[in-house]
Amino acid sequence: MVRESIPKEGENIKIQSYKHDGKIHRVWSETTILKGTDHVVIGGNDHTLVTESDGRTWITREPAIVYFHSEYWFNVICMFREDGIYYYCNLSSPFVCDEEALKYIDYDLDIKVYPNGKYHLLDEDEYEQHMNQMNYPHDIDIILRRNVDILQQWIEQKKGPFAPDFIKVWKERYKKIRQY
């Protein structure tokens, strides 16, 4: 990753999700950077405009903290709802950043984590379909399945973005930055 492309704290950036075939999948119009390093980007957003590949748009319903890592094949969205914190985890390529946006390839598989800690692997049918349509290499399949296991371990061990302190720290940081 180019040093100049690492987003800085307080900066607002776009997030662009692509599919394996290089086509845009989804764009979040604005996320405020809370931490940006070579390996980790943490951001926050609330009521953010999201544009789908077909041009449809919608607005996120609640504040969220997003977590991206340059070495893991997943990213995590921590959503703050009235009944607790939900996590939506995308199996994806590690992120890259350039002047335009933070970017990653979405590989269909998702894990949804509920406030009680239970979780479900989602979209396995979509993954199989796209793996065949877009010819995901066998190596990618192995990497993604290994990262599903890593992600499940993190969830069960309350590690990384699933740690209670992670939520407290970054939610507070996001509130402070938004006040300025």
UniProtKB/Swiss-Prot annotation:
Cofactor note: Activity is highest with Mn(2+), followed by Co(2+) and Mg(2+), but the enzyme probably uses Mg(2+) under physiological conditions. Has low activity with Ca(2+). Cannot use Cu(2+) or Zn(2+) ions.
Signal peptide per UniProt: none
Recorded GO MF terms: magnesium ion binding; nucleoside diphosphate phosphatase activity; ribonucleoside triphosphate phosphatase activity
Resulting phenotype, residue 45 to A: Loss of activity with GTP. Increases the specificity to ATP
Gene3D superfamilies linked to this entry: FomD-like
Disulfide bonds: none
Origin superkingdom: Bacteria
Catalytic activity: a ribonucleoside 5'-triphosphate + H2O = a ribonucleoside 5'-diphosphate + phosphate + H(+); a ribonucleoside 5'-diphosphate + H2O = a ribonucleoside 5'-phosphate + phosphate + H(+); GTP + H2O = GDP + phosphate + H(+); ATP + H2O = ADP + phosphate + H(+)
Pfam family, one: DUF402
Effect of mutating residue 126 to A: Strong decrease in activity
InterPro entries: DUF402, FomD-like_sf, Ntdp-like, SA1684
Mutagenesis / variant outcome for changing residue 58 to A: Decreases catalytic efficiency with GDP and ADP as substrate
Residue numbers annotated as active site: 26
EC numbers: 3.6.1.15, 3.6.1.6
Residues holding Mg(2+) 2: 108, 110, 123, 126
Binding site for Mg(2+) 1: 90, 106, 110
Impact when changing residue 108 to A: Loss of activity
Quaternary state and interactors: Monomer in solution.
Family: Belongs to the Ntdp family.
Stored HAMAP family: Ntdp (MF_01568)
Protein name according to UniProt: Nucleoside triphosphate/diphosphate phosphatase
Native source species: Staphylococcus aureus (strain N315)
